[in-house]
């Protein structure tokens, strides 16, 4: 079984590309059913966030990568975008190292941001819920979570309050000096939307409107702030008229706010959704200011230096953690092989022993039967090692011969 991952992320792909290849907003159960239906795909975990879409897989044949790319391409709306031009393939320990760094926030656009760990955990949970994760992949994710917890507790990588959500609010503050007199509309009440809400409430705006597909979730979040209100997405046309700042963090497959919704009133539009929820053409209107996820980079760069030192400490923890994981995996593999070896030996002994005991019970010479039993066991136990040594000798594999000699306590010098 081999461990691989296929990824499209912000490092190689701009927002319009990431939007096309995003798997968020699609039926999760359908996604897992379809990917597990591919021959040689054994287990899978699908992660899709604003900055990346990644698929982690246990496969039985590396040639299946082409089939997975075809599967992924099938969800792309614009045929001009070809996944082979953008994806990155990782294999084996590279996958585990990347996932550890990712969960710790070292691969994020915002260095050390904590939200990604929650997103990785959510993806893991959904995979389990859809019976798509196996023992090996499960062990990988458990070690990843333990590593991320250790990094958070032993470093200050997440000390600065910097996230995509925080950076979005920073951009809004740059455009509008006095947010306390402004109305803010947040679209989406997921993890990022809730984080946005918390950052906005700290600025004490005149009013916060939170729109979501299900109003119950929005009501739960807004109940803690007296100037906040919860709304359905269907109310967006009316809400936009009131809003000075519109921030979107929602999973949709097409634009839900376009130029037809806005008049001459100056507004700040910030879209951190993938795929994009706010039409970029909003920024072409003279009175508007428009930012997308990629525009947040400038804000993020200001905070990177503060975290670089903590990042190096986190890297050391990750390297150590990976070494621990690999050592444990070696033990699991060897223990499994040892168990199988004993089961094989038990099978050989049990069969010959039963035959020998039956002969003794029938009055045959016990001494002769025991000698014969010992000879048969010796012959059966040594059959495969002898065949293997002969084959290794034919192929000139002296390393295999030395290894087998050591296994049986023979003199390796001869």
Curated annotation (Swiss-Prot):
Among the Pfam families in the record, one is Shikimate_DH
Task: Tell me the Gene Ontology biological-process terms attached to this UniProt entry.
Answer: protoporphyrinogen IX biosynthetic process from glutamate
Positions in coiled-coil regions: none
Checking PROSITE patterns in the record gives:
GLUTR
Q: Where is this site: Important for activity?
A: 98
Sum up the protein's function in the record's words: Catalyzes the NADPH-dependent reduction of glutamyl-tRNA(Glu) to glutamate 1-semialdehyde (GSA).
Anything else the record notes?
During catalysis, the active site Cys acts as a nucleophile attacking the alpha-carbonyl group of tRNA-bound glutamate with the formation of a thioester intermediate between enzyme and glutamate, and the concomitant release of tRNA(Glu). The thioester intermediate is finally reduced by direct hydride transfer from NADPH, to form the product GSA.
* Notes on the domains: Possesses an unusual extended V-shaped dimeric structure with each monomer consisting of three distinct domains arranged along a curved 'spinal' alpha-helix. The N-terminal catalytic domain specifically recognizes the glutamate moiety of the substrate. The second domain is the NADPH-binding domain, and the third C-terminal domain is responsible for dimerization.
Q: How does it assemble?
A: Homodimer.
What name does this protein carry?
Glutamyl-tRNA reductase
Task: Tell me the classification of the organism that encodes this protein.
Answer: Bacteria, Pseudomonadati, Pseudomonadota, Gammaproteobacteria, Thiotrichales
């Amino acid at each position: 079984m081999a461990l691989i991952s296929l990824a499209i992320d912000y490092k190689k792909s701009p927002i319009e590309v990431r939007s096309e290849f995003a798997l968020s907003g699609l039926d999760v159960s359908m996604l897992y059913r379809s990917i597990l239906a591919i021959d040689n795909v054994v287990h899978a975990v699908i992660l899709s966030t604003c900055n990346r879409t990644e698929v982690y897989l246990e496969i039985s044949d590396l040639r299946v990568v082409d089939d997975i790319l075809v599967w992924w391409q099938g969800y792309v709306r614009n045929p001009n975008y070809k996944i082979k031009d953008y994806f990155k393939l990782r294999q084996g320990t590279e996958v585990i190292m990347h996932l550890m760094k990712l969960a710790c926030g070292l691969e994020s656009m915002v260095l050390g941001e904590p939200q990604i760990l929650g997103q990785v955990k959510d993806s893991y949970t959904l995979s389990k819920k859809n019976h798509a994760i196996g023992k090996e992949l499960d062990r990988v994710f458990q070690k990843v979570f333990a590593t991320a917890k250790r990094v958070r507790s032993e470093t200050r990588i997440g000390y600065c309050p910097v996230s995509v959500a925080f950076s979005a609010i920073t951009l809004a503050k740059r455009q509008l000096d006095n947010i306390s007199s402004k109305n803010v509309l947040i679209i989406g009440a997921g993890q990022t939307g809730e984080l946005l809400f918390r950052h906005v409430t700290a600025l004490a705006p005149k009013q916060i409107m939170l729109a979501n597909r299900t109003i119950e979730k929005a009501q739960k979040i807004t109940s803690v702030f007296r100037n906040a209100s919860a709304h359905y997405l269907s109310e967006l046309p009316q809400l936009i008229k009131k809003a000075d700042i519109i921030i979107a963090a929602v999973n949709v497959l097409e634009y839900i706010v376009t130029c037809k919704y806005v008049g001459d009133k100056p507004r700040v539009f910030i879209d951190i959704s993938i795929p994009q929820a706010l039409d970029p053409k909003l920024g072409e209107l003279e009175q508007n200011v428009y930012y997308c996820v990629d525009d947040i980079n400038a804000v993020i760069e200001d905070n990177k230096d503060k975290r670089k030192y903590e990042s190096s400490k986190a890297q050391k923890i990750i390297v150590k953690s990976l070494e621990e994981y690999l050592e444990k995996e070696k033990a699991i593999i060897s223990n499994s092989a040892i168990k199988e070896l004993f089961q094989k030996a038990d099978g050989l002994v049990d069969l010959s022993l039963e035959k020998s005991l039956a002969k003794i019970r029938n009055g045959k010479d016990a001494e002769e039967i025991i000698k014969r039993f010992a000879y048969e066991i010796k012959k059966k136990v040594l059959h495969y090692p002898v065949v293997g040594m002969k084959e290794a000798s034919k192929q000139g594999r002296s390393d295999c011969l030395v290894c087998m000699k050591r296994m049986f306590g023979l003199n390796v010098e001869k």
